[in-house]
Each structure stands twice: as C-alpha cells, then as structure tokens.
Amino acid sequence: MERRQAAYKELQKQYPEIKELESIGAVSSDVQGDTANKVGAILAKYPKGKIDAIWGTWDAFSQGAYKALKENGRTEIKLYSIDISNQDLQLMREPGSPWAVSVAVDPKLIGATNVRLIANKIAGEATPATYDFKAAAIPQALLTAQPGAVNVASLGKIIPGWGQTEDFVAPWFATLEARSK
C-alpha cells in the first residue's frame, strides 16, 4: 500500500489540477463495510457535482466505496481502483456501475513469478531485490462488451498479455519440468 500511495503522490505532482477532498482507508475486520460507512459519510458532506471520482488503492476499499455509491444513489461519481477479483469484475459489469477502471496484475502470475524467484534464489542464481510487475488496465467498457461471463481466469482472452511473462524462467527449468512428467 505504501508504494501505491507514493505513486499516487507523484501523480498528484504531475497533475496539480487533481484535488483530493478526503483520504480514508484502514484495514479492519470488515474493510468493505467500514469503507462503505466512511464513504457514505463523505457523500453526505459533498453534494452532487462536488466529487468527480474515488480512487481505491486496494479492491477491498473499492468494493466498500462501490457499495456506498450505489446505496446513496451517487453513481455519477466514477470509481477507479487497483487490484481485481471475480467480485470486482461482476460489480464493474452491473448496469449503471460507477466502477470505471481497475488496474491489476494477474494474481496467478504473481505467484508463479514468486516461485520462479525462489527457485532461482535456492539455485544460487542472481535475483533482484525488488521486481515491478507490469499492470494492465481493465476498463469497464471492455468488460461490458463481453457476451459471456468474465472472471480473473478468463481475462487473458480479452486483455493482451494478461497472466504472461517469461521473467526469471531459467534455462534449467525445462529440465525440471521434463523430470516431473
């Protein structure tokens, strides 16, 4: 979350016309419910036309914001987020959904890449101290244009490069794979 917040602060510097009215978000036993309550209180303070968008650094926050927007009839406010889940995809596809875009990395790819890094580390190969995954924008318009159900596993059919990277695949992985068959 800290890196996401730092990136947001940099974005604010690049686009000073973006004005932050409020900042909320805390991890709790009911993140979605707590966020919905906090966003609901904020919506009561600002009449229509005063808030253009809500940005969530985590989809659990965004799910709560979505709930508040729907419950308060404030779907004119667009919702932008980081991370994706099957629930998020369903909410984005609902008629009249304010959830405009989510930016995410395939969670399965994160796991696979981490396993590759661990394998390389155990084998004594050089590994980086940090790694930045290439995130993909998942626009609502693309999701609603799909004729059938959409889930995280099927995003690779509509998002180019989703779930794909050859980073940290060592040549000796093929030998290990052949032995396991």
Task: Describe the residue ranges of each PLM region.
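A residue-level marker of the well-folded mature domains of exported/periplasmic proteins
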Residues: 1-181
